[in-house]
């Protein structure tokens, strides 16, 4: 196998316009390729979402790669320098929607599996891939549903690598070994609509909420810890009024979000918000949505193996970090003993002209292969 195979598979995946939750047979392509080296494929489709669980072997330890074949919309196609679903090599980079997030990662792991199995046909344990077409969307029928199926039948993962783009300045410089939780609130502050010249006959919800708003934004929710930054509270939307300049609004809608560390809990944050609103006499309705709990993989075998593989392949020392947004790791952690995220550069994800460095592609595949070898080979390398 030449090192161009990762590039060619990445191109084949990018050329399929799999805008979430449409898979465009990307998973079929992966299954056909991995079937040749002994992987069994199980399709787990829910609604419009396609998921596939691919596994080679029946014993522990289980090393699983998790990824998604869906991509975000392209945005204005005319702003791209080359068609987003026509993978293009230019200036030492591979351009196309999904190049960084995250079809290149998938391609690199598949080719890593091919090389590893060729060299170690009787390897220890099992290799698995959990692939979904619903990561960029609502994420309701994707990885979370597959995890439920696996959990129900007692199928657990020892080591999981999520192929999200994690590199900042150079391939391998950062490994995500955890993520903050995400808790959102949809707050409706209730008032009484009236003429702006007669405020005594109305109740302005903007005014009644203002003191609580100040306290919410100044509150120190926690101090963070050695793994996580302090919990953050951010308001994303505030809407009120009819558009007229002479009407006191009857309601104010406020949308906000917590990105919270392991120093805080979902229940605790909710209680503190309600206490602040009640303290200021706000009349309100508040709906909550938690899209993920914080999780952490402490430095251990998987992080050590990954850092060694990166050092040997890329010549850099990987930093462990929990920064950034949420990923499907929040679902997989329920059945995975150790979990990290490791992939290409995140500099252009979701952007016009999304791309990865061409010379990073064989390196990433080599990193994945070294991880497999150190975890599953008959003899560690």
From Swiss-Prot:
Enzyme class: hydrolase
InterPro entries: Bact_exopeptidase_dim_dom (IPR036264), DapE_proteobac (IPR005941), Peptidase_M20 (IPR002933), Peptidase_M20_dimer (IPR011650), Peptidase_M20A (IPR050072)
EC number: 3.5.1.18
Pathway: Amino-acid biosynthesis; L-lysine biosynthesis via DAP pathway; LL-2,6-diaminopimelate from (S)-tetrahydrodipicolinate (succinylase route): step 3/3
Protein residues bound to Zn(2+) 2: 101, 136, 350
GO MF, any single term: zinc ion binding
Alphabetical GO biological process terms: diaminopimelate biosynthetic process; L-arginine biosynthetic process; lysine biosynthetic process via diaminopimelate
Comment on bound cofactor: Binds 2 Zn(2+) or Co(2+) ions per subunit.
Protein residues bound to Zn(2+) 1: 68, 101, 164
Pfam family, one: M20_dimer
Active-site residues from the entry: 70, 135 (proton acceptor)
Subunit structure: Homodimer.
Similarity comment text for this entry: Belongs to the peptidase M20A family. DapE subfamily.
Protein's job: Catalyzes the hydrolysis of N-succinyl-L,L-diaminopimelic acid (SDAP), forming succinate and LL-2,6-diaminopimelate (DAP), an intermediate involved in the bacterial biosynthesis of lysine and meso-diaminopimelic acid, an essential component of bacterial cell walls.
The name this protein goes by in its record: Succinyl-diaminopimelate desuccinylase
